[in-house]
Amino acid sequence: MEKDPKERREEEQAPVQNEEACPMGGGEGPKPRENVRGDWDPPAQDFREDMPNGLVNNIDIIDGDADDMERFMEEMRELRRKIRELQLRYSLRILIGDPPHHDHHDEFCLMP
């Protein structure tokens, strides 16, 4: 037998055991925190004094790596220049009609 719609709604809204029934809707939820003015420390001017020695040493190493990075970037620029030059040479050979010369190092001959 079908239950009356009113009875079904009451069953659906029945609170679970050990749970308070709370109305659906606005209700009282958590309130937003208000700005609390308190004492605050301004940011440290020299951040190294607040850091452990290990981190300060790492920063010194990172500063030293700047030279390595500059060297690396210079090598990359040099490689790009060489690649561009080789590509240009190859393109010019194709345009001129001069096929690349094979050195035949990878070929071998079987003698009878």
UniProtKB/Swiss-Prot annotation:
PANTHER family (UniProt xref): PROTEIN BEX1-RELATED, PROTEIN BEX5
Location in the cell: Cytoplasm
GO biological-process terms attached to the record: signal transduction
Pfam families cross-referenced by the UniProt entry: BEX (PF04538)
One of the record's GO molecular function terms: metal ion binding
Record family assignment: Belongs to the BEX family.
Region of interest (His cluster), residue spans: 101-105
Binding-site positions, Zn(2+): C109
Region (Disordered) location: 1-56
Basic and acidic residues bias (residue ranges): 1-12, 30-51
A cellular component annotation (GO) from this entry: cytoplasm
Keywords: Cytoplasm, Metal-binding, Ubl conjugation, Zinc
Reported modifications of this chain: Ubiquitinated. Degraded by the proteasome.
The name this protein goes by in its record: Protein BEX5
